[in-house]
């Protein structure tokens, strides 16, 4: 006689899914749901558990837009638009902290990580831009001033420090100050994100120890040797669609070429849109996904770009879900990802009963 399947303890339920992405594709799977936690149990084939609901599609950690400016948009539609978490890379500290708090308590509000104010050289970008209030910017000229700015971001619970290196008509840090700011941030335990614009700025950032480029370099075509150096030292936030918003431009072509070679060289790509910069959709940007696909990223690489910090075994609070499994046709991958929804783990059984 076959043994009856085990009964889940009170508060636990088991669900199945057609596929699960946890830094890699797990295939048909069984997952255990306990409150707001969803844990991968193992392959569906041969499982001794008895799922009480089936998720008809693929489960991911919550999709992240790794470059937004929530002070320039209404973030209310992000979760409904398929984005579970954002990294705000320039904002008023008090305002972005309020949005962080909302994301921690409201199921329909996007989860927020943030860098806080932009740290730049005196007169540096974006102090000359109308869209950037002075409260968004810390202009620093000395190591003492940069230390104070970094300490302010740390005290505000920032997840990163953002610096700007825009040499197109604006001052940038000297080599000494650049390395000083990066070292101070690292000593405080925070990664450094840099805005690199103008000849040589991406390579300056990498040489100084910057961790993440806020944009794919678009003002110059980098050499293969430079691309290789970047691939071994930084990750890049894509932001391709801002160069034309679906229209062909020289900047889009340069950035796409740089990102294609960067990804082929093994570089880490993060999905990001620079939301707030022009006519971009609130939520998943299908044009950005199509640009990533055209740059050579396959389904696994796009998943990795959308989930930059994947768990190896579990999800908390929310998941991203796409009906079906990743298509075998490369031309269909981007549109498949653009259909993602954000779901609360606590409601999965009711959603898919």
Cite the ranges covered by each PLM segment.
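Hydrophobic faces of well-ordered beta-strands that scaffold small-molecule active sites
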Residues: 60-68, 86-88, 112-116, 161-163, ...
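A conserved glycine-rich beta-strand in the N-terminal activation segment of trypsin-fold
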Residues: 24-33
């Amino acid at each position: 006689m076959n043994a009856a399947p085990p009964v889940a303890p009170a508060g636990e339920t088991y669900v199945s899914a057609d596929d699960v992405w946890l830094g890699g594709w797990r295939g048909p799977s069984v997952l255990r749901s306990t409150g707001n936690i969803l844990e991968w149990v193992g392959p569906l084939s041969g499982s001794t558990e008895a799922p009480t609901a089936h998720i008809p599609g693929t489960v991911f950690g919550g999709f992240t837009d790794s470059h937004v400016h929530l002070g320039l948009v209404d973030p209310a539609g992000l979760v409904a638009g398929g984005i579970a978490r954002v990294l705000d890379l320039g904002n008023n500290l008090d305002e972005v902290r309020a949005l962080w708090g909302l994301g921690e308590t409201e199921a329909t509000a996007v989860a927020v990580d943030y860098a806080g104010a932009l740290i730049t050289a005196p007169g540096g970008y974006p102090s000359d831009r109308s869209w950037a209030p002075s409260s968004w910017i810390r202009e620093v000229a000395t190591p003492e001033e940069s230390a104070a700015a970094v300490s302010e971001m740390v005290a505000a619970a920032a997840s990163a420090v953002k610096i700007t290196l825009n040499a197109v008509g604006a001052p940038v840090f000297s080599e000494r100050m650049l390395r000083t700011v990066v070292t101070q941030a690292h000593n405080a335990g925070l990664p450094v994100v840099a805005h690199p614009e103008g000849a040589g700025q991406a390579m300056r950032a990498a040489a100084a120890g910057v961790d993440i480029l806020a944009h794919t370099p678009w003002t110059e075509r980098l050499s293969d040797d430079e691309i290789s150096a970047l691939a071994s030292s930084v990750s890049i936030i894509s932001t391709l669609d801002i160069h034309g918003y679906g229209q062909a431009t020289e900047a889009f072509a340069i950035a796409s070429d740089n990102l294609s070679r960067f990804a082929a060289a093994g570089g880490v790509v993060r999905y990001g849109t620079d939301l707030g910069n022009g006519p971009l959709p609130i939520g998943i940007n299908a044009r950005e996904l199509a640009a990533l696909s055209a740059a050579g990223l396959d389904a696994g690489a796009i998943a990795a770009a959308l989930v930059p910090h994947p768990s190896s075994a579990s999800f908390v609070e929310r998941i991203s879900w796409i009906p079906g499994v990743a298509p075998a046709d490369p031309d269909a991958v981007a549109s498949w990802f653009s259909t993602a929804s954000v779901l609360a783990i606590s409601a999965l059984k009711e959603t898919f009963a």
